[in-house]
Regions:
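Acidic, surface-exposed loops and disordered segments
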Residues: 1-176
């Protein structure tokens, strides 16, 4: 379904950028998902060890350390088992940019296109966190000097259909 991938990339490509820099780039990951998953889970596990070994780790972050340990242990026991990181999705789109706002705007437009194409996505903050701590992940995805990973979009066909959105707090609006 390369035509759908091209439409998603075009949604990002045609998004406005600061001073028309057009500094956003994309890495499409399909065949390398297992290797990227291994590297990411290994990095998260190492991060969890540091967090659990430090008395300075804020208590609200300890739940993530324990979660990352369980994810890694589950992966080591059965690499082909349940995937709690990328959820067996067939496609990752990693958005990179020099300017975070440019990359964020492109990611938002791409998410809308993904939805319009009948696909589902979520943004993997765990991947972004691991990539920020492991330069080998950046090398693997072709991160250039001056670029930052803005988002990792996990894309596939949704297994469930939601009848409503999640509850949200009211918008905080100032009118002048």
């Amino acid at each position: 379904e390369e035509d759908k991938i091209e439409k998603i990339i075009d949604a990002g490509r045609f998004t406005q950028t600061s001073t028309n820099m057009q500094d956003v780039s994309y890495t499409i990951v399909k065949d390398s998902i297992p290797e990227l998953r291994r590297m990411t889970l290994g990095t998260l596990n190492a991060m969890a060890d540091k967090m659990l070994g430090s008395e300075e780790t804020p208590k609200h972050l300890l739940k993530y350390a324990h979660m990352w340990k369980r994810m890694y242990e589950s992966f080591v026991e059965n690499p082909d088992g349940p995937d709690q990181l990328f959820f067996k999705a067939p496609l990752l789109i990693i958005v990179k940019a020099q300017n975070e706002i440019d990359g964020g705007l492109a990611s938002a437009k791409m998410e809308l296109m993904i939805d319009a194409l009948g696909l589902g996505t979520y943004f993997s903050g765990f991947f972004e966190r691991a990539a920020s701590m492991n330069p080998k992940i950046g090398e693997m995805i072709g991160l250039k000097e001056g670029e930052k990973i803005i988002s990792c979009m996990v894309v596939g066909y949704p297994r469930v259909e939601y009848k409503r959105t999640v509850p949200r707090k009211p918008a905080r609006v100032t009118r002048m």
